[in-house]
């Protein structure tokens, strides 16, 4: 028998940054309207970005939560963990949950996040492997690392690289297998990637770029991997970190249009009435104007705020400015950061500098008329949020270009203090 049907004004599916920012935005304009949050997770809200630090032991699991029960009580929010969204019936404003219950809503925000994308490698369903997307994943991997002697990480994105560093520091022999010709493809350029690769090699890690796994087989110790070139690898710990895919299965038959993500307009509204999306959204890109996925924490927060304000009818809501990529990465005592586009605009200019002694590298890309369009660095110091604002505001840096390239942190903050009031 179906469980009782709940009624709420605002239903939020998901519980991370976008969802929490939407709650804040709604409550700024509507202090009393009932809010219900449903999430597939079993825990209070936390950020997936902190999970590598749970694995390493730098962050205690009990200290990573973004909000506590008091937050939901103060904001009059019904928080329902272990309540995954199963199906959406947008034509009658009803969400069906995996436990058999249903919620009838007036306004719905879809912020359901993503799950690991598992590659279709023959034999992958016959071996044990780890992923890293939830707190439970992190705790499981943390326990396994302590026992591992020979580990293989599939994928050289930021999740895989963080985990590989933890394994190296724990004393395991670690091999990273990556299909692309460089590490951290899509995050950093070739120069930065080579610096990251050298740091891993210096620490004892093994790197195999341009490599594809074509078969997996179980062994007594764990798994045997066969690569396209015939090379074989043995692993007692296998981590699959080959990317994520947005959670959208519940949209089948819902009338909500989706492609790579959930398609939204500049107020984060989907193609269905009374339904918004954030973080899982495919929204307008800043540089191209076409709809793109930008699955990073700062953007999820912005999208959640815009969606929440729009749902509550806040007259102060502004259009989403567009997606600007921003990524930071700490590795073996070093750090790398990338903000904006790596594509050089027509007539644009690229300025680079590299100090071999300090290992500092900077690349800045400018449009023909002066604004910054992208900035990337290793062991460089600049504020990613300030750089993103310089890009979004199309600030002409022509008069300050030499000073800016020499010290983007100081000059960026100088511009901020003088003009952003």
Curated annotation (Swiss-Prot):
pH dependence: Optimum pH is 8 when measured with benzyl viologen. Half-maximal activities are obtained at pH 9 and pH 6.8.
Binding site for FAD: 15-18, 39-40, 279-297
Cited SUPFAM superfamilies: FAD/NAD(P)-binding domain
Catalytic reaction annotation: phenylglyoxylate + NAD(+) + CoA = benzoyl-CoA + CO2 + NADH
Control of this protein's activity: Activated by magnesium ions and thiamine diphosphate.
Keyword vocabulary terms for this entry: FAD, Flavoprotein, NAD, Oxidoreductase
A single MF term (Gene Ontology): NAD binding
Induction: Induced anaerobically by phenylalanine, phenylacetate or phenylglyoxylate.
Domain of life: Bacteria
Documented EC number(s): 1.2.1.58
Single Gene Ontology BP annotation: L-phenylalanine metabolic process
Required cofactor(s): FAD
Record-stated family: Belongs to the FAD-dependent oxidoreductase family.
Record's function text: Involved in the anaerobic metabolism of phenylalanine and phenylacetate. Catalyzes the oxidative decarboxylation of phenylglyoxylate to benzoyl-CoA and CO(2). It can also react slowly with 2-oxo-3-methylbutanoate and use different electron acceptors such as benzyl viologen, methyl viologen, FAD or FMN, but NAD seems to be the physiological electron acceptor. Also catalyzes an isotope exchange between CO(2) and the carboxyl group which proves partial or complete reversibility of the oxidative decarboxylation reaction.
PANTHER family reported in the protein's UniProt record: NITRITE REDUCTASE [NAD(P)H], PYRIDINE NUCLEOTIDE-DISULFIDE OXIDOREDUCTASE DOMAIN-CONTAINING
UniProt subunit comment: Dimer of heteropentamers composed of an alpha (PadG), a beta (PadI), a gamma (PadE), a delta (PadF) and an epsilon (PadH) subunit.
NCBIfam families referenced in this protein's UniProt entry, alphabetically: PhenlGlyoxDHPadH
Name of the molecule in the record: NADH-dependent phenylglyoxylate dehydrogenase subunit epsilon
Organism: Aromatoleum evansii
Phylogenetic lineage: Bacteria, Pseudomonadati, Pseudomonadota, Betaproteobacteria, Rhodocyclales
């Amino acid at each position: 028998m179906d469980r009782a049907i709940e009624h709420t004004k605002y239903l939020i599916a998901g519980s991370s940054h976008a969802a929490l920012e939407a709650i804040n935005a709604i409550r700024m304009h509507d202090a009393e309207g009932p809010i219900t949050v449903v999430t597939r997770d079993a825990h209070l809200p936390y950020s997936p970005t902190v999970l590598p630090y749970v694995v390493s032991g730098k962050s205690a699991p009990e200290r990573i939560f973004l909000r506590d029960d008091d937050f939901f009580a103060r904001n009059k929010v019904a928080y329902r963990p272990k309540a995954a969204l199963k199906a959406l019936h947008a034509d009658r404003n009803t969400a069906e949950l995996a436990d058999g219950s249903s919620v009838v809503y007036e306004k719905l925000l879809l912020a359901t996040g993503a799950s690991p994308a598992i590659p279709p490698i023959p034999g992958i369903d016959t071996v044990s492997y780890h992923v890293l997307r939830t707190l439970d994943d992190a705790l499981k991997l943390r326990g396994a690392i302590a026992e591992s002697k020979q580990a293989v990480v599939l994928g050289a994105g930021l999740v895989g690289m963080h985990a590989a560093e933890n394994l190296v520091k724990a004393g395991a022999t670690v091999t990273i297998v990556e299909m692309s010709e460089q590490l951290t493809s899509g995050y950093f350029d070739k120069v930065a990637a080579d610096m990251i690769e050298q740091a891993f090699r210096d620490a004892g890690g093994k790197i195999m770029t341009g490599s594809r796994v074509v078969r997996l087989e179980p062994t007594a110790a764990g798994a045997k991997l066969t690569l396209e070139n015939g090379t074989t690898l043995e692993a007692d710990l296998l981590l699959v970190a080959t990317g994520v895919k947005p959670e959208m299965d519940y949209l089948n038959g819902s009338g909500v249009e989706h492609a790579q993500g959930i398609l939204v307009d500049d107020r984060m509204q989907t193609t269905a009435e009374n339904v918004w999306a954030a973080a899982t959204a495919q929204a307008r890109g800043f540089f191209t104007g076409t709809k793109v996925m930008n699955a990073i924490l700062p953007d999820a927060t912005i999208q959640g705020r815009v969606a929440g304000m729009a749902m509550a009818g806040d007259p102060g809501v502004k259009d989403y400015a567009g997606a600007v990529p921003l990524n930071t990465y700490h590795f073996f005592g070093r750090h790398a950061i990338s903000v904006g586009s790596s594509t050089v605009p027509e007539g644009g200019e690229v300025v680079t500098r590299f100090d071999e002694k300090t290992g500092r590298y900077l690349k800045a890309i400018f449009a023909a008329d002066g604004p910054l369009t992208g900035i990337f660095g290793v062991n460089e110091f600049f504020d990613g949020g300030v750089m993103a604002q310089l890009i979004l505001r199309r600030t002409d840096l022509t008069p300050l270009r030499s000073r800016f390239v020499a010290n983007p942190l100081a000059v960026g903050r100088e511009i901020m203090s003088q003009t952003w009031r």
